[in-house]
Regions:
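Kelch-like beta-propeller repeat domains
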Residues: 1-271
């Protein structure tokens, strides 16, 4: 899920149901968008809104269990498949964010047919470029990524590593990854959801899954430490929810996810 700041709508595509419907939320209602062709059914894809070019970028996911590596752009009217000279290997359950300071989509990790991935890629000028860094987050999938506009850093948290759930925090400045030694942090988990909240100038994290336990906790990261928030009754515990910051309405938007009894289809605003 991503927020299209030019048109003032939240954009969502696909999901655990494996459908191929594009939905937009204008602050009042979700509306399906009709189009002639598009990315097709998939789960585990990632999306990010490129505010420099005014398009929502979608990459990968899986169809019938097979990871994908296609790149698509949604301009509000049509989905356009982008053919690039190179591309990240096929994957699902990766993480993506748009680095507004540098005008680049950042893609990290995910799960290929061969296992977890730990690579970093950037998408700009119609092409994918792999980032070769001295060190970085270990391989993982089902992690979460957001761009901190206040500190001009991409923030990564948690995920499913090769040996279990992770609870580490990393930042990326476009040149190198740095692990954050926070005094406090959410419990290790996969499938959490994260978005940078412009009003507070902090990154908000919600839910996820630790082992077999779904979570409903809410945390805020200020660039150096995590603080748990208690905003009244939160959405029910879940993992894999779609989350995006709606800058027009000043609210973090949440949709769906996997609850303790199955898939969810509820919509929440956090202000």
């Amino acid at each position: 899920m991503a927020f299209d700041s030019r048109r003032g709508v939240v954009v969502m595509y696909g999901g655990s149901a494996g459908d191929s419907v594009t939905w937009e939320f204008d602050g009042i209602a979700w509306r399906p968008r009709a189009f002639a062709a598009g990315p097709g059914p998939r789960t585990g894809a990632v999306m990010g809104y490129d505010s420099t070019r005014g398009v929502t970028v979608l990459f990968g996911g899986a169809r019938s269990g097979s990871p994908l590596q296609d790149t698509w752009e949604w301009n509000g009217v049509l989905w356009i498949r982008v053919t690039t000279p190179t591309a990240p290997p096929p994957r699902q359950r990766a993480a993506m964010a748009f680095d507004a300071g540098r005008g680049r989509i950042v893609l990290v990790g995910g799960e290929a047919a061969s296992g977890k991935l730990g690579d970093t890629w950037e998408y700009y000028a119609g092409a994918w470029h792999q980032v070769v860094a001295a060190s970085g987050p270990p391989a993982r999938s089902a992690h979460t990524l957001a761009y901190d506009r206040t500190r001009s850093r991409v923030l990564l948290f948690g995920g499913a590593g090769t040996a279990g759930d992770l609870g580490d925090t990393w930042t990326y400045d476009g040149a190198a990854w740095s692990q954050v030694a926070a005094a406090h942090a959410p419990a290790a988990r996969q499938g959490a959801s994260m978005a940078f909240e412009g009003g507070r100038g902090k990154t908000i994290l919600f839910g996820g899954q630790s082992g077999s336990t779904k979570r409903d906790d809410i945390w805020a990261f200020d660039g150096s430490d995590w603080v748990e928030l208690y905003p009244g009754e939160p959405p029910v515990a879940r993992s894999g929810a779609a989350l995006a910051y709606d800058g027009r309405r000043g609210a973090v938007m949440l949709f769906g996810g996997a609850g303790t009894a199955g898939p969810l289809a509820d919509t929440w605003m956090f202000r």
